[in-house]
Amino acid sequence: MAEGQAPAPPQPEGDQECMCTQDKVLQFLNKMADESGIKDLTDPALAEFLTDSDALKGIRDLFHYPKAGTLPDVDPTLVDPNADSIYLCGNSLGLMPKVTEEVMKEHLDKWAKMGVFGHMTGEVPWAHSDEHCLEGVGRLVGAKKEEVSIANSLTVNIHVLLTAFYKPTETRHKILLESKAFPSDHYAIESQIRLKGRTVEESMVCMEPREGEETLRTEDIIDYIENNGDEIAIVFFSGIQYYTGQLFDIKAITEAGHRKGCLVGWDLAHAFANVPLHLHWWDVDFAAWCSYKYGCTGAGSIAGLFVHERFLHDKRDRMLGWWSHKMSSRFTMDNVLDLDEGAAGYRISNPPIHCVAAMLGSLKIFDQVSLENLRSRSCYLTGYLEYLVKTLFGENSEQRTTKLSILIITPENFHQRGCQLSLKFSSPIDVIYPELVKRGVAVDKRYPNVIRVAPVHLYNNYVDVRRFISVLQEVAHIVEDHA
């Protein structure tokens, strides 16, 4: 380790593997049913027992959890407005940690009392505020401090990174990504290709799943790279696909890209603070993420980026601003760039303190519980949801009591998913979704016929999951009656 560099993060014990399986979930449910004396695994009373027995149940108290009556379009004749909502939408926007109010108030008070002097004074000087997040964020993504920066928004950071790393040549100019990537990623890549003088038709490759399948197979991605990698400049996938909820094998795909001389980057919007990441050890070249989903920093809050330490002293052309300049000489103002090293050199402007304060508040939660423990909890919560959906709504399930059936398009393999399950409905979601909302359910719909449901490891519990299923059963009968 070079002098002044941070130590490497701990090596992963099993790549990105989760030890959970459907059999283990079923064994767990049966064990808890035996302990409680509840025979039926779908009984709501079991959810109560599971929640009461959960060693991490107290984390929920660290968050503001919305009441049903505070959500829009809730019908008070159908649900108690004072009851907790069924908030399973943290894959879209995470809930607010209570400590965030305190941290933000500290900086609002500081602004009121100090004005401009807040930039350089206090426990967290604003000009250095992003640096106070680096250790915690580094732990969440498995990186050294100098490999991460807190800056901008996700799409801006994708542009920042692609501007620097996408250097097309006549023979190597393609960018490989998954089909139906999040629109902002798609547009960013299209625009970067055009800005570099190429055409989207020749340089953008959107990989499709096999016919009749919803998700990509890892072996198909690797085969494509091995067969076509000499033409690929950058492999750029989502860590977790926003629509299907598929967690890609980041390590294996990165290795495949490097074998063919490709740079490999990742959009970790749905992976950050959701699943353990080991970007340093997986040898990822660069990555970007937002923080307002599982990171719980608030809508549109500050994003992050990763640049591997192999580029620590790399001075490649990039988008620049005064925050790209080393702090030690930044305020000399001589207009001679002294480029900061590593990920810090990809910053552009000073950090917005209110967004950084939200990040500092969120990191206080992750200081209290490891992402590895949260991941284990997540597997059982999502596994419980999967069991209930398959048992009560599976197309071939004997226990299904409605015409409505649901197909889970998210991979069954726990190694290939995080908190989210994407549910594909046999009836139009435009009929189902409003009825869920009326009953205090917060999930989100994605056309043509998917509702995404995410029991978040930080603040959701088994009761939330079972209440959702109960509402879904009620709505299914209503849809049938009005068909």
From Swiss-Prot:
User: Quaternary state and partners of this protein?
Assistant: Homodimer.
Broad EC category: hydrolase
Question: Would I find Ligase among this entry's keywords?
Answer: no
Modified residue annotations for N6-(pyridoxal phosphate)lysine: 293
Pathway of action:
Amino-acid degradation; L-kynurenine degradation; L-alanine and anthranilate from L-kynurenine: step 1/1; Cofactor biosynthesis; NAD(+) biosynthesis; quinolinate from L-kynurenine: step 2/3
Keywords in alphabetical order, please. Cytoplasm, Hydrolase, Pyridine nucleotide biosynthesis, Pyridoxal phosphate
Query: What EC number(s) is this enzyme filed under?
Result: 3.7.1.3
- Function recorded in the entry: Catalyzes the cleavage of L-kynurenine (L-Kyn) and L-3-hydroxykynurenine (L-3OHKyn) into anthranilic acid (AA) and 3-hydroxyanthranilic acid (3-OHAA), respectively.
What are this entry's molecular-function GO terms? kynureninase activity; pyridoxal phosphate binding
Which cofactors, if any, are listed as required?
Answer: pyridoxal 5'-phosphate
Cell compartment(s), UniProt: Cytoplasm
Which residues does pyridoxal 5'-phosphate bind? 154-155, 182-185, 238, 267, 270, 292, 322, 350
A GO BP entry is: L-kynurenine catabolic process
**Membership in a protein family:** Belongs to the kynureninase family.
According to its UniProt record, which reaction does this protein catalyse? L-kynurenine + H2O = anthranilate + L-alanine + H(+); 3-hydroxy-L-kynurenine + H2O = 3-hydroxyanthranilate + L-alanine + H(+)
Task: Quote the protein name from its UniProt record.
Answer: Kynureninase
Q: Which SUPFAM superfamilies match?
A: PLP-dependent transferases (SSF53383)
Kindly state one GO CC term assigned in the UniProt record. cytoplasm
